[in-house]
Amino acid sequence: TLETHAKIARAFGRHRLAAEIGYERLAGQKALDEYNQQLIHAALRYGIEGGVVRLEVGADYYHDKVKSVEAENYIIPFVRLNLNLGTDGLCPFFEMDGDVRENSYRSLTKLNPYLLNPVFGTKSSVDYNGRFGIGGSIWRGKFDYRAYAGFSIRDNHLYWYSADVVQGSDILAAGLTMLPSMARQTVLSFNGEVTWRPASSFRTELGVHGYIYNDDETKLHNGAPAFDGNFSAHYDGRKISFGAGIWLQSTRKWSDYQLDAASGAESFGSVEVPFAADLRVNFDWKVSGGITLFAEGRNLINRRLYQYPWYPEYGANFTVGVKANF
């Protein structure tokens, strides 16, 4: 892997300009020696700080070349628009952005460690996102809120499915490997986020998100939730900080490829995982300016939490360590 980036920016009065360029080269070895990809990224931004309007606009250009495949070019618009109506309690906003993500074997194994070896994608996943809504701060800054709707177009979106060996109605081996398939997906989302600060060192946070998916280009299930949410409370002191919260996620469903060991017949089923509730806690102790001791716990109510079908996390998990800043 070879990766390099450069960025330059200039501000003059209420205006600012920024430009960025990046290059990434990925190459496989041994069983993956046929894989070679180069990704060139260039971005341009212009921003202005006005009395009523705060605006930043621009675009991102990507040149994506995978060996033995025709090169692809993508242009993704970028917008950040905030309106000042004279009150902190009501601030409309509009946002557009996106991303291009390569699907090398390295990237796919980071997303799913049960990936069939060796597999890589000859196309990158490309997202185009838009959001609009309102936000603000009321009650003398003690209550912040953000309510918005979002829409995404996801080209070459990854749909993961598991592979099983069956014999009749009996599953001989479940979830042996997982494979990605690609198709376009569109998503409409409705989101609400609030933060309440009854005191300067204490805050509570609540988030609720609902999703409507259009997966018409494939018959595969997307493995994504129709709803997720979170509620947490945090104390941030000068030396000690701690918090607790619960993260919720609706049922999810993946497709399941089944091969009959006796007849050789192929079919697709589905795997559904239950509603998830994850109770988490965290604790930080700032021993000195550069040293912090921390402890984190998750799944404290011992639920089966699935990031992938067939492979749940069992029991509570704890992490204890030291953070050092120099």
Model-derived segments and their meaning:
Residues T1-G51:
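Outer-membrane beta-barrel transmembrane domain signature of Gram-negative proteins
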Residues T1-T4, E34-I40, A71-P77, S124-G130, ...:
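Residues that define the transmembrane beta-barrel architecture of outer-membrane proteins
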Residues T4-R10, Y23, A42-I48, V79-L83, ...:
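Residues on the lipid-exposed face of transmembrane beta-strands in outer-membrane beta-barrel proteins
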Residues R14-R16, R25-A31, V52-R54, H63-V69, ...:
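Gram-negative outer-membrane beta-barrel proteins
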Residues A43-V165:
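Long, internal scaffold/assembly segments composed of regular secondary structure
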Residues R106-K123, R154-Q185, Y211-N230, Q249-K286, ...:
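Outer-membrane beta-barrel domain signature, especially the mid-to-C-terminal portions
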